[in-house]
A protein has these predicted regions:
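Arg/Lys-rich, alpha-helical DNA-contact motif
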Residues: 3-112
Length: 112
């Protein structure tokens, strides 16, 4: 992971100790991409400890998606499961769109 993401051992340790990355025997491409992003942010003074709130926000997003799909999740049929698998990523993308709009709007106020 260190070599693939270009991360220093201490940065990875910080990401693990703050709960941004979960320690594991092996890591997938999603984790490699996340660590690469953490490396890039760290170059600008944004450390793993600063990302805790983002992790908590992501967990709240998942809870919101789960709640919105609760009626489908209670069903056991294949059609409902397929619909959940279709809708969950779409809802996540929409939440990202809203978050992006909030950030873009705030940046425009700061840097007109």
């Amino acid at each position: 992971l260190l070599a693939a993401a270009g991360a220093a051992p201490q940065l990875l340790n910080d990401a693990i100790s703050t709960g941004i990355i979960v320690a594991a025997e092996s890591y997938g491409e999603d984790t490699v991409a996340m660590v690469r992003a953490i490396v890039a942010l760290d170059r600008h003074g944004i450390e793993p400890r600063h990302l805790r709130a983002m992790r908590a926000s992501a967990e709240r997003d998942v809870a919101l998606i789960e709640s919105s799909l609760s009626s489908l999740l209670r069903r056991q049929d294949a059609g409902s499961r397929a619909k959940v698998n279709e809708l969950a990523p779409e809802l996540a993308r929409r939440l990202d769109d809203v978050r992006h709009a909030f950030v873009a709007s705030a940046l425009m106020r700061i840097f007109p």
